[in-house]
Amino acid sequence: MDAKMFDTICSRDAISWLPDEVLGKILSLIPTKQAVSTSLLAKKWRTIFRLVDHLELDDSFSLQAVKDQTPGLRKHVRFVFTEDFKIFVDRTLALQCDYPIKNFSLKCHVSKYDERQKACVGRWISNVVGRGVFELDLRMKDPGIHFLPPHLVASKTLVKLTLGTQLCLGQLPSYVSLPSLKSLFIDTIVFYDIEDLCCVLLAGCPVLEELSVHHHDFIATPHTISSPTLKRLSVDYHCPDDVDSASHMSFDLPKLVYLEYSHCALGEYWQINLESLVEAKLDLGLERKVLRMDVTDLIIGIRNVQSLHLSPDSVHVIYSYCRHGLPVFKNLVNLSFGSKNKRGWRLLANLLKQSTKLETLIVKDLNGYTGDVSMPLNKVTSLHILGYRGTADEVKQLKSFIGEFECLELVQVDVAEAAEDNGKILQSKRDLMMLLGVSLPSKCQFKVT
């Protein structure tokens, strides 16, 4: 609903008969800038705006260019929020008085040297924290040191917090206490002390269950994640300039059940405590500055998983740099696997050997598979092939690959979108049904999607 339509409805008195609480909910569903504009219609709407419990403030409509005056560095232009944006935010918060708020989102560009702008941001955050905010999304771009207001790290009501992006935080207070926080998303944050994430921030979150740590093209990548309560973790690092042979990673997370980890392979994994892990998704790449990669301890640390997802890059890394061999995956029943070459299929054979309970195998592509890589005896009952393109070589590969599994009850082949026109897809399906249908056990279902 745009502002003009909303103003038209209001001017016709089409909804003013609704209860104020309902009108407040309606205003919460439209962009904050338009919701604020309704306060100009009549005194009644100024009162109703106080009931809006969801605010999204973004300075993208009001930026000004300033020159970076950092001594010794090449001068370049940065963008920061304008005085008009400051007035708009101050007015918006003032209109609401001290009414409770549930969700607050602030996206702004802060001047590196303007302490007045930094103070404004701190005041805005303290305002909504003082009103009992539940969910807080702060995306602040500040090339200088930015200190979080004390009220933020002592909130009793905050349940979900997002902090970013490319932000250098000043020293955190030692009294961080977020007793209700269950979800934390950190996007490219540099902490004043490298241990502040683990030893100060996470230590002050006694009921935290979900954590996402993303770090892209920036310095000071967090290398230790520890929490006695965490259940879900997503780590996405892409910082080639911040990695070398001394880089390491540590996960001390005894209650973690879900891990998504995207990073380059490192030389050391100091402490991997993931005893409760149920599902893991690994995307491990190569970095030339890491001279001796070894992912053995990481792979041993995830050995209790029931579901494992390996990207093609991860398969290559594990085959080449799990230097002390694969552990036994005693609980593994679901495996999603991608390979780029013959080495990857050899790793699959080793995984089948070490995973005697495996029932479901998802193969992302048959690229590189040859019949001379034989699979050990296994109990796989469900085989799912992704990315089938309908080539003659793939039919041969698929027929050979299926022959390695004697206990199959279901084979499903997904045709890739690249197998362009419908005629080709239909032909591929008919070919597969004819060529493979007769070679499958009678109890096995065969599907092409």
Swiss-Prot record:
Keywords of the record, alphabetical order, are:
Leucine-rich repeat, Repeat
> Could you tell me which PROSITE patterns the record lists for this protein?
FBOX
State the SUPFAM superfamilies in the record.
F-box domain, RNI-like
Domain of life the protein comes from: Eukaryota
Instruction: Reply yes or no: does the keyword Transmembrane apply.
Output: no
Task: Spans of LRR repeats, please give.
Answer: 161-188, 191-215, 216-237, 239-263, 287-312, 340-365
Pfam families attached here? F-box (PF00646), LRR_At5g56370 (PF24758)
Positions of disulphide bridges: none
List residues of the F-box domain.
12-64
* PANTHER family in UniProt: BNAC06G06520D PROTEIN, RNI-LIKE SUPERFAMILY PROTEIN
Q: What is this protein called?
A: F-box/LRR-repeat protein At3g60040
Source organism (scientific name):
Arabidopsis thaliana (Mouse-ear cress)
Q: What is the lineage of its organism?
A: Eukaryota, Viridiplantae, Streptophyta, Embryophyta, Tracheophyta
